[in-house]
C-alpha cells in the first residue's frame, strides 16, 4: 500500500484539443485538491490516443462514446471481456453472462433487469469507469418545422421526416 497520497503520481491521457485539455485540468485539480494525488496531463493526437488505449499505455484516459442505438446494451457491450472496444482489460464473468443472456431474453422487463444488474456490477461494484458528462444539445426550432425529432443517442437529429408547414 501507499502511506502518503502525495507519493501517488498518475498520468491522464487525452486528445490534443483545447476542450480535452480543460477537462483534464479539472480532473488534475480535483485529484490534487481532494485526494492529494499528483496527476500529469498527456495530450496526444486522436489517432495516438486510440492506439495507446488499445495497447493499454495509460494510467487514466478520457474518452467518450455515443451509442449507435437507444438501448443500454449499446453502452454496456463495450466492456465485455473479449470485446473489440474493451481497451481497459476489464473482465468480469458475471457481467459477461448478463450481457450474453440479455441478447436472448424476450421478456423486456427481465432483459432490462439483466442490463441494470450488469451496469451495477460495472459502475458500482467494480468501479471500472467514472462517467464525467452526458452530452446534450439545445436547439432553437422554427414552430413551422413539423416532425423534427431530436434523439438522445447517435445522430442528434434526422430531417428525413421533417416538413416545413405553410
Please give the residue ranges for each predicted region:
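Acidic/histidine-enriched alpha-helical segments
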Residues: 10, 41-51, 137
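Surface-exposed acidic, glycine-flexible loop patches that form ligand/cofactor-binding
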Residues: 1-5
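Short alpha-helix C-terminal cap/hinge motif
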Residues: 26-41
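Short, contiguous strand/loop micro-motifs
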Residues: 14-15, 35-37, 85-86
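Short, well-ordered beta-strand elements
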Residues: 7-16, 39-42, 59
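Detector for C-terminal structural segments
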Residues: 18-30, 50-166
Amino acid at each position: 500500500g501507499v502511506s502518503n497520497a502525495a507519493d501517488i503520481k498518475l498520468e491522464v491521457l487525452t486528445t490534443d484539443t483545447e476542450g480535452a485539455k480543460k477537462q483534464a485540468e479539472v480532473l488534475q485539480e480535483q485529484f490534487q485538491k481532494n485526494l492529494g494525488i499528483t496527476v500529469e496531463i498527456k495530450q496526444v493526437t486522436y489517432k495516438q490516443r486510440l492506439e495507446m488505449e488499445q495497447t493499454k499505455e495509460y494510467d487514466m484516459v478520457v474518452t467518450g462514446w455515443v451509442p449507435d442505438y437507444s438501448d443500454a446494451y449499446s453502452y454496456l457491450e463495450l466492456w465485455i471481456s473479449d470485446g473489440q472496444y474493451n481497451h481497459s482489460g476489464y473482465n468480469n464473468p458475471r457481467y459477461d453472462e448478463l450481457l450474453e443472456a440479455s441478447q436472448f431474453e424476450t421478456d423486456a422487463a427481465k432483459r432490462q433487469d439483466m442490463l441494470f444488474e450488469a451496469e451495477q456490477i460495472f459502475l458500482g461494484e467494480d468501479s471500472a469507469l467514472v462517467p464525467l458528462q452526458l452530452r446534450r444539445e439545445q436547439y432553437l426550432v422554427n414552430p413551422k418545422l413539423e416532425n423534427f425529432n431530436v434523439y438522445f443517442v447517435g445522430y442528434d437529429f434526422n430531417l428525413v421526416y421533417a416538413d416545413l408547414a405553410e
